[in-house]
Structure formats: structure tokens, C-alpha cells
């Protein structure tokens, strides 16, 4: 339904090689949506889809990820994540995640960790999976994945207003599980 959302997918793909950037695609009104994440996202990223945010502090257009990330990446943080371990239990079909942080001095305030499990290469031919595409035919500008990602697929050179996920290599960075179903951690 979101014909401008290829801009978010391409922007996340462009950031993949950037150190210390973890991209998360939050979906809305499609089979990949997590209602608790989607419903609370406007707290940090106002303005609708596709929107972009960095560190729950900055928000803007996904095309500004690089600038937003650069303005935050060297900020002093109160702690660091030393380790993350994930364990899959095939019997229960659940993933358990544990982490260890290191505080860089005294910490006061309400600090929380939130874990988001993301998945790449999601495809389906079921209803709700094709990507609406307002960039079709190039009239709304160029919107193309980097050449080394998703085959450099271009949403602007196709004339398709609805693009099957398999055509562009599938959805990447998709939030699939949110710890405690709470964006606040």
C-alpha cells in the first residue's frame, strides 16, 4: 500500500556497509507488520511512512540516514554492548537472547534495552506482499538499490505499480520480533 516505501528500502540498503548502523524496517498494514512496534513508532518517527529515525532521537526522511547517523555516531553513550548471544530452541520454536553491557561510569535515569530480531530476503506471493511503487517509470525520480544489493533492482525503470517481492530480491531488515512487545524496552 505504501508506494513511497521503496525509498526506505533503498536507503537502508545504502547504509548496510556503514559501521555501527543497524537498520530496522518497521512495516504497517501488511503481513510483516508487528502491531506493537508499528503502533508506537510515531512516538519517535512522526510523519508517516516511509519515515526514518536514528537512536530514537532524530527523525526525518530515509534519504537522510547517512546525515542523521553521522550526527549521532560519535556522541558519548552511557554504556556499550559487550556481547549478544541468541539461542534457538527447535522444540519450542523460540529464540532466547541475552546480552551483557558495560556502564561507562555512573548511570542514573531510566535506561532500558530492547531487542529486535530482523530478517532479510522475505518473499511471498500471498496477498499484501507486493510492494506498491510510485517510482514506476521514473516520473518520481530514481530509486535503485546499490549494485551489490538485490541485484541493483530499480523501482524507477520498471513500469510496475505493484512489484512482487521476488522481483526486487525480497524485503530486508524487517522487524520480526520485538522484546516484550514494547518499543521502549
Annotate each language-model stretch with its function.
Residues 10-11, 19-185:
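Short, conserved sequence motifs used for protein processing/export or organelle targeting and
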Amino acid at each position: 500500500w505504501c508506494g513511497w516505501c521503496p525509498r526506505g528500502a533503498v536507503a537502508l540498503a545504502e547504509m548496510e556497509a556503514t559501521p555501527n548502523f543497524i537498520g530496522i524496517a518497521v512495516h504497517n498494514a501488511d503481513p510483516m507488520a508487528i502491531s506493537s512496534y508499528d503502533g508506537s513508532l510515531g512516538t519517535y518517527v512522526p510523519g508517516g511512512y516511509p519515515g526514518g529515525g536514528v537512536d530514537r532521537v532524530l527523525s526525518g526522511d530515509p534519504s537522510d540516514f547517512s546525515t542523521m547517523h553521522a550526527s549521532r555516531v560519535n556522541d558519548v553513550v552511557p554504556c556499550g554492548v559487550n556481547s549478544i548471544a541468541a539461542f534457538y530452541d527447535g522444540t519450542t520454536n523460540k529464540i532466547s537472547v541475552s546480552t551483557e553491557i558495560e556502564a561507562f561510569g555512573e548511570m542514573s535515569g531510566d535506561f532500558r534495552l530492547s531487542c529486535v530480531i530482523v530478517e532479510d530476503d522475505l518473499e511471498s506471493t500471498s496477498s499484501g506482499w507486493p510492494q506498491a511503487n510510485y517510482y514506476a517509470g521514473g516520473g518520481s525520480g530514481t530509486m535503485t538499490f546499490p549494485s551489490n544489493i538485490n541485484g541493483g533492482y530499480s523501482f524507477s525503470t520498471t513500469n510496475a505499480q505493484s512489484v512482487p517481492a521476488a522481483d526486487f530480491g525480497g524485503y530486508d531488515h524487517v522487524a520480526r520480533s520485538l522484546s516484550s512487545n514494547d518499543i521502549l524496552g
